[in-house]
């Protein structure tokens, strides 16, 4: 794109109800524009007063997505990264808490020269600065062609008003020809009358107009396709072109949404409206992904043993990484959500895990459900079930091994009991002040991208195909180095450490002991992409498929498969 052409800004708003899929709609549009050869980046404006979601309850907010530079962000940032296949930074997520904190700090410094600080212009100017900052140049010096900004919340909510006003002012500042407003709304189907109702969408657009924004296009979320008559009515009553009324009916997979929007002509309309270079969409990569999604050759069941399974969004990136691991093998991954409490006893673990092909133990905080995670890991280790542990999953893997193999019956973590007699997991030295209450909890963990050196001959080294890797982290606790020798002598392999060997990053069992039993202190799910599955998850699914193929072989007393005797054929 010509460098003289200004960056275009696309704002995505939502109406009628929350959880309509604004983030997925925005991500899919970004994917389409990127497939047309445009440089696209994305941003989320969140109207809550928290500075970031780092200390929020997973049951309320879902997962916390960590960027390379260590920002704790909204889970929609994960959608953006997966659909665009790019890495975003902390400026991709703006919250009301960040905006107000910055404005108040400036006021205290005297930056406003005695002005009365108000929502308009001071808060809105701060928001505008953060929106426009996304349109800078990339590492290669080229400017971004399109910035897609999702405005969180629902039009009409008081919390979103400053963000909507800032977006309106951005349109005024950069020119209408460089700005596009996309409104996502609900068109409900009323069963008894057999009708699709447009009134909620009309009222939602009316509320948007009240704050000075006229949408350029409307994406209608529904459980079925909209007939032309309904589209024509929405076009007339909402004052948008009929070509800009887009149906986005429920799809079999979230990865179908770009095709749905393209079929409806949304990307072509936007490109014409913003006078962007018109190139055909290159479907090469996405078509291959959809083939793997819809036409798998294998199917495996993976148990996700977690504390927050009542809200699957708490493990959104883990679930998507597991599914992507299946795509690598043209396999469908069926997730079984297992509450860790249900695996606290041997009988409970067997009941929930005896027929799964693999197990994933994800991260979390606090003592609740820990004994269940340990029970699940004991079952996985002794029955040869391929297992992947993430963050807390690594710590539980070490505790379980210390108790049941090494003989440290009181092994534990200082997170759960500061006075545990055998702290095989301990607080990181630089984290002790925060844990003891001497500092803020928010934003103070070991966050962001950190390197690890992998041991030759290990599973980790094999699946990564490299001896030095980088992964994103979010933790305060680590394997206690005082117990490393004792654990290694008992057969546990510390297959990856920080380059200076001070922090354990990967733990596993040798392949001759277990087919695939590995964990990492990092969060590799955050770097997985549907088109580039993460090697740890692909390795887990590969091991699960291999185990399926060997199910006809008996299991010996160690829980491992053995070759059948000649008379067993």
Swiss-Prot record:
Pathway per the UniProt entry: Pyrimidine metabolism; CTP biosynthesis via de novo pathway; CTP from UDP: step 2/2
An annotated GO BP: 'de novo' CTP biosynthetic process
Reactions mediated catalytically: UTP + L-glutamine + ATP + H2O = CTP + L-glutamate + ADP + phosphate + 2 H(+); L-glutamine + H2O = L-glutamate + NH4(+); UTP + NH4(+) + ATP = CTP + ADP + phosphate + 2 H(+)
Cellular component per GO, a single term: cytosol
Binding site for CTP: 18, 157-159, 197-202, 233
CDD domains: CTPS_N, GATase1_CTP_Synthase
One Pfam family in the UniProt entry: CTP_synth_N
Residues annotated as domain Glutamine amidotransferase type-1: 301-550
Amidoligase domain: annotated span: 1-276
Top-rank EC class of the record's enzyme: ligase
Protein EC: 6.3.4.2
Annotated residues for binding of L-glutamine: 364, 392-395, 415, 476
Keywords: ATP-binding, Glutamine amidotransferase, Ligase, Magnesium, Metal-binding, Nucleotide-binding, Pyrimidine biosynthesis
Residues annotated as catalytic: 391 (nucleophile), 523, 525
InterPro entries, alphabetized: Class_I_gatase-like, CTP_synthase, CTP_synthase_N, GATASE, GATase1_CTP_Synthase, P-loop_NTPase
Regulation of this protein's activity per its record: Allosterically activated by GTP, when glutamine is the substrate; GTP has no effect on the reaction when ammonia is the substrate. The allosteric effector GTP functions by stabilizing the protein conformation that binds the tetrahedral intermediate(s) formed during glutamine hydrolysis. Inhibited by the product CTP, via allosteric rather than competitive inhibition.
Binding-site residues for Mg(2+), renumbered to this chain: 76, 150
Miscellaneous field: CTPSs have evolved a hybrid strategy for distinguishing between UTP and CTP. The overlapping regions of the product feedback inhibitory and substrate sites recognize a common feature in both compounds, the triphosphate moiety. To differentiate isosteric substrate and product pyrimidine rings, an additional pocket far from the expected kinase/ligase catalytic site, specifically recognizes the cytosine and ribose portions of the product inhibitor.
PANTHER family: CTP SYNTHASE, CTP SYNTHASE-RELATED
Family: Belongs to the CTP synthase family.
Role summary: Catalyzes the ATP-dependent amination of UTP to CTP with either L-glutamine or ammonia as the source of nitrogen. Regulates intracellular CTP levels through interactions with the four ribonucleotide triphosphates.
NCBIfam families associated with the record: PRK05380.1, PyrG
This protein's name: CTP synthase
Gene (name only): pyrG
């Amino acid at each position: 794109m010509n460098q003289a052409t200004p960056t275009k800004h696309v704002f995505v708003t939502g109406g009628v109800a929350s959880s309509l899929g604004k983030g997925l709609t925005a991500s899919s549009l970004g994917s389409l524009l990127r497939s047309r050869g445009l440089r696209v980046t994305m941003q989320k404006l969140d109207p809550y007063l928290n500075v970031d979601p780092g200390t929020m309850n997973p049951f309320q907010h879902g997962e916390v997505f960590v960027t390379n530079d260590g920002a704790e962000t909204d889970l929609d940032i994960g959608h953006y990264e997966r659909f665009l296949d790019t890495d975003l930074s902390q400026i991709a997520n703006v919250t009301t808490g960040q905006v107000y904190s910055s404005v108040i700090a400036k006021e205290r410094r005297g930056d406003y020269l005695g002005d009365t600080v108000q929502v308009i212009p001071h808060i809105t100017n701060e928001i505008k600065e953060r929106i426009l900052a996304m349109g800078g140049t990339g590492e290669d010096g080229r400017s971004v062609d399109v910035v897609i900004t999702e405005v969180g919340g629902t039009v009409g909510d008081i919390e979103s008003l400053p963000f909507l006003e800032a977006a309106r002012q951005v349109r005024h500042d950069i020119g209408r020809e460089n700005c596009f407003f996309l409104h996502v709304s609900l068109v409900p189907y009323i069963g008894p009358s057999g009708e699709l109702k447009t009134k909620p969408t009309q009222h939602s657009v009316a509320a948007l107009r009240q704050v000075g924004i006229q949408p350029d296009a409307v994406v209608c979320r529904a459980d079925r396709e909209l007939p032309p008559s309904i589209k024509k009515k929405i076009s007339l009553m909402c004052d948008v072109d009929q070509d800009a009324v887009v149906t986005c009916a429920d799809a079999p997979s979230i990865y179908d949404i770009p095709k749905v929007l393209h079929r409806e002509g949304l990307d072509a309309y936007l490109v014409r409206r913003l006078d962007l270079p018109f190139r055909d969409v290159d479907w090469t990569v996405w078509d291959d992904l959809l083939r793997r999604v819809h036409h798998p050759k294998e199917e495996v069941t993976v148990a996700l043993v977690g504390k927050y399974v009542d809200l699957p969004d708490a493990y959104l990136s883990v679930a998507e990484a597991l599914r992507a691991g299946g795509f690598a093998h043209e396999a469908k991954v069926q997730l079984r959500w297992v509450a860790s409490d249900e695996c606290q006893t041997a009988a409970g673990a067997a009941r929930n895990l005896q027929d799964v092909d693999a197990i994933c133990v994800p991260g979390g905080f606090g003592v609740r459900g820990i004994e269940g995670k340990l029970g699940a890991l004991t079952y996985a280790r002794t029955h040869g079930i391929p297992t992947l542990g993430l963050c807390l999953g690594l710590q539980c893997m070490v505790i379980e091994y210390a108790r049941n193999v090494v003989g440290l019956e009181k092994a534990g973590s200082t997170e759960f009991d500061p006075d545990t007699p055998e702290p095989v997991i301990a607080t990181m030295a630089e984290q002790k002040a925060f844990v003891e209450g001497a500092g803020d909890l928010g934003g103070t963990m070991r966050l962001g991208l950190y390197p690890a050196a992998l041991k030759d001959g290990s599973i980790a080294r094999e699946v990564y195909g490299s001896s030095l890797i980088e992964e994103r982290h979010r933790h305060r606790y680590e394997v206690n180095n005082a117990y490393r020798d004792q654990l290694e002598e008992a057969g546990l392999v510390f297959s990856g450490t920080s380059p200076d060997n001070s922090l354990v990053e990967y733990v596993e069992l040798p392949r001759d002991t277990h087919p695939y039993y590995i964990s990492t202190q990092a969060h590799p799910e955050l770097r997985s992409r549907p088109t580039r599955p993460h090697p740890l998850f692909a390795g887990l699914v590969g091991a699960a498929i291999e185990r399926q193929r060997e199910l006809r072989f008996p299991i010996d007393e160690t829980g491992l498969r053995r070759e059948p005797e000649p008379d067993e054929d």
